[in-house]
């Protein structure tokens, strides 16, 4: 079996991948993550997931390389990582009482053959009605400024949800394990 490489610096994705109990290493790819004109959110995450994997193929020529990328979409608009309290407050205020769809692009590249599998896994979060005081308490408690949509579903962010909808809850955290297992099996990897 080729070695596994996770093309990411995300501690969330690293933690998720450990659940499969397969040995892997991590390396952060250096790519331009800019959104192209006329590119849908679906196409964006698929492209970036594959570009992340391809960026490391030369350095890791005999690996199965996992790339992933995620965006949150609210009312047709892509929500990026907020980076600041003020931007996170804006995002959560806009999301209050509505639904946010997370699109997670996933790519598995066999760097020996160049063959790849790519998919996009959606997951929708239906948000509670949130007042400004609740949003501010949450932001001060968790500081989710590095997370698309301004919350951490794996932490206190779940308290902001009314319900969720999707086929793979791990996609919400950034690495859809159910779909990844399908891809790994197609590459001959035994899981479990």
Swiss-Prot record:
One of its GO terms (biological process) is nucleotide metabolic process. GO terms for cellular component: cytoplasm. It comes from the Bacteria. Its cofactor is a divalent metal cation. Its EC number is 3.6.1.-. The active site is at residue 69. It holds the Pfam family Maf. The record marks 12, 70, 154 as: Important for substrate specificity. Nucleoside triphosphate pyrophosphatase that hydrolyzes 7-methyl-GTP (m(7)GTP). May have a dual role in cell division arrest and in preventing the incorporation of modified nucleotides into cellular nucleic acids. This is 7-methyl-GTP pyrophosphatase.
């Amino acid at each position: 079996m080729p070695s596994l490489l996770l093309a990411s610096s995300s501690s969330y994705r690293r933690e998720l991948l450990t659940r499969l109990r397969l040995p892997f290493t991590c390396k952060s790819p250096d790519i331009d993550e800019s959104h192209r004109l006329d590119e849908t959110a679906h196409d964006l995450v698929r492209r970036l997931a594959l570009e992340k994997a391809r960026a490391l193929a030369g350095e890791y020529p005999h690996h199965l390389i996992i790339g992933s990328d995620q965006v949150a979409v609210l009312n047709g608009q892509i929500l990026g990582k907020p980076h600041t309290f003020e931007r996170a407050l804006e995002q959560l205020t806009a999301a209050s009482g509505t639904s946010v769809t997370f699109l997670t692009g996933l790519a598995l590249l066999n760097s020996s053959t160049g063959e790849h599998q790519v998919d996009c896994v959606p997951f929708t979060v239906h948000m509670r009605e949130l007042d400004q005081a609740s949003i501010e308490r949450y932001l001060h408690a968790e500081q989710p400024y590095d997370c698309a949509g301004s919350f951490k579903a794996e932490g206190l962010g779940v308290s902001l949800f009314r319900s969720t909808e999707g086929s793979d809850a791990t996609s919400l955290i950034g690495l859809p394990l159910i779909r990844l297992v399908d891809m790994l099996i197609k590459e001959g990897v035994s899981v479990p």
